[in-house]
């Protein structure tokens, strides 16, 4: 019965604190992204950001082409046999 009385306190503690303190890396990232070196933002993040950008653009172009293909197919009437 005693363990049930401590449950609300345990639950609130579990959600309000972290076991591992994380270092605030926002100032470091701001320094990288605010640096005036002539690079676009999608390249300043490194290799991962460049790959993610290229993948996103590829999927966008392929998806647009696929949509236009099906719009063209839908716009052409079928011939009666």
Curated annotation (Swiss-Prot):
One GO MF term attached to the UniProt entry: oxidoreductase activity
Question: Its Gene Ontology biological processes?
Answer: mitochondrial electron transport, cytochrome c to oxygen; mitochondrial respirasome assembly; regulation of oxidative phosphorylation
Q: Which Gene3D superfamilies match?
A: Cytochrome c oxidase, subunit VIIa (4.10.91.10)
Which pathway does the UniProt entry assign to this protein?
A: Energy metabolism; oxidative phosphorylation
Cross-referenced InterPro entries, in alphabetical order? COX7a, Cyt_c_oxidase_su7a_sf, Cytc_oxidase_su7a_met
- Key words, A-Z: Membrane, Mitochondrion, Mitochondrion inner membrane, Oxidoreductase, Transit peptide, Transmembrane, Transmembrane helix
Q: Where in the cell is it found?
A: Mitochondrion inner membrane
Question: What is the membrane topology here?
Answer: Single-pass membrane protein
Q: What happens when the gene is disrupted?
A: Reduced body weight due to diminished lateral muscle mass, leading to reduced swimming capacity. Mitochondria show reduced formation of mitochondrial respiratory supercomplexes with CIV dimers, leading to metabolic alterations and non-pathological muscle performance decline.
Boundaries of the annotated transit peptide in chain numbering: 1-21
Q: Name one Pfam family in it.
A: COX7a
CDD domains, sorted: Cyt_c_Oxidase_VIIa
Main localization of the protein described in the UniProt heading: mitochondrion
What is the protein's known function? Answer: Component of the mitochondrial respiratory complex IV (CIV, also named cytochrome c oxidase complex), the last enzyme in the mitochondrial electron transport chain which drives oxidative phosphorylation. The CIV complex is the component of the respiratory chain that catalyzes the reduction of oxygen to water. Acts as an assembly factor that specifically drives the homodimerization of CIV complexes, mediating the formation of mitochondrial respiratory supercomplexes (respirasomes) containing two CIV: supercomplxes with two molecules of CIV show improved activity.
Give the UniProt family note. Belongs to the cytochrome c oxidase VIIa family.
Q: How does it assemble?
A: Component of the complex IV (CIV, cytochrome c oxidase). The complex exists as a monomer or a dimer and forms supercomplexes (SCs) in the inner mitochondrial membrane with NADH-ubiquinone oxidoreductase (complex I, CI) and ubiquinol-cytochrome c oxidoreductase (cytochrome b-c1 complex, complex III, CIII), resulting in different assemblies (supercomplex SCI(1)III(2)IV(1) and megacomplex MCI(2)III(2)IV(2)).
Annotated protein name in UniProt = Cytochrome c oxidase subunit 7A1, mitochondrial
Q: Which organism is it from?
A: Danio rerio
